[in-house]
Amino acid sequence: MAHLGAHFAFRSRWQKTDDELCRHSMSFILHKAIRNDFFQSYLYLLEKIPLVKLYALTSQVIDGEMQFYARAKLFYQEVPATEEGMMGNFIELSNPDIQASREFLRKFVGGPGRAGTGCALDCGSGIGRVSKHVLLPVFSSVELVDMMESFLLEAQSYLQVNENKVESYHCYSLQEFTPHLGRYDVIWIQWVSGYLTDKDLLAFLSRCRDGLKENGVIILKDNVAREGCIFDLSDSSVTRDMDILRSLIRKSGLVVLGQEKQEGFPEQCVPVWMFALHSDRHS
């Protein structure tokens, strides 16, 4: 509660600044740029990081590329195209992650009124760890999308046993990727939503909604902060709390069919949650 009170006081101070003090100043311009990109999270970010530094790390555009995304690409250029690399060197968490994902998916796929088993899309796929262990055993075909060409090249050999079921590899950043309209029974988005700004995550979820077949579902699985929003300087990602995440989901035109916390991870880890989402047009 103390944190929440401080947060509201901080928000009130910034609102006064917006309205009265610096509408035409450089600080207002920087503040407005960050707020445009992180409209749900920016006040939490500003509480932890000075305005000018936060702008330089996120919304500043250099050589046509927003620094929030440029810095993430630099980070992943150094990540090996292995299962260990995909798990951030926490390979011991891979098996409990896969098992929980399989069990969660099973609740929403197959049978009347559920998603079909035709085609799945693996977003932020890396080398295809989730595709190999979770999606390919269930779906007739799978597509992968990732911004790193090196990961997708490795995926072709990593998934070689199932190569006849891999429909295509898309080398795109998710903020630039549009799923085919009405094509997918399941769109899987794991450990990648934090690499999108609030603005781009909202837009991407909306495009994914349009990519679903009738009764299709989006499975969103990611770290969820206990409170507020946390910016990781090392890999240029944000971890949002449940309120922020659910607000973005709602604004994207999706509703939560079910949610479940990942079990079997060490207590010191940031909590990981799974969400099953579908279009509010079918509610």
From Swiss-Prot:
Q: Does the keyword Membrane apply?
A: no
What catalytic activity does the UniProt entry give for this protein?
Answer: N-terminal L-alanyl-L-prolyl-L-lysyl-[protein] + S-adenosyl-L-methionine = N-terminal N-methyl-L-alanyl-L-prolyl-L-lysyl-[protein] + S-adenosyl-L-homocysteine + H(+); N-terminal L-prolyl-L-prolyl-L-lysyl-[protein] + S-adenosyl-L-methionine = N-terminal N-methyl-L-prolyl-L-prolyl-L-lysyl-[protein] + S-adenosyl-L-homocysteine + H(+); N-terminal L-seryl-L-prolyl-L-lysyl-[protein] + S-adenosyl-L-methionine = N-terminal N-methyl-L-seryl-L-prolyl-L-lysyl-[protein] + S-adenosyl-L-homocysteine + H(+)
User: Which GO terms fall under molecular function for this chain's record?
Assistant: N-terminal protein N-methyltransferase activity
| GO terms of biological process kind | N-terminal protein amino acid methylation
UniProt-listed Enzyme Commission number(s) = 2.1.1.299
Q: Which GO terms describe its cellular component?
A: cytoplasm; nucleus
Q: Which domain of life is it from?
A: Eukaryota
Positions binding S-adenosyl-L-methionine in this chain are 124, 129, 146, 174-175, 190
Query: Is the S-adenosyl-L-methionine keyword given for this protein?
Result: yes
What this protein is called in its record is N-terminal Xaa-Pro-Lys N-methyltransferase 2
Query: Which keywords, in A-to-Z order, does the entry hold?
Result: Methyltransferase, Nucleus, S-adenosyl-L-methionine, Transferase
What top-level class of enzyme does the UniProt entry assign?
A: transferase
Question: Record's family?
Answer: Belongs to the methyltransferase superfamily. NTM1 family.
- Main location per the UniProt record: nucleus
Its subcellular locations are: Nucleus
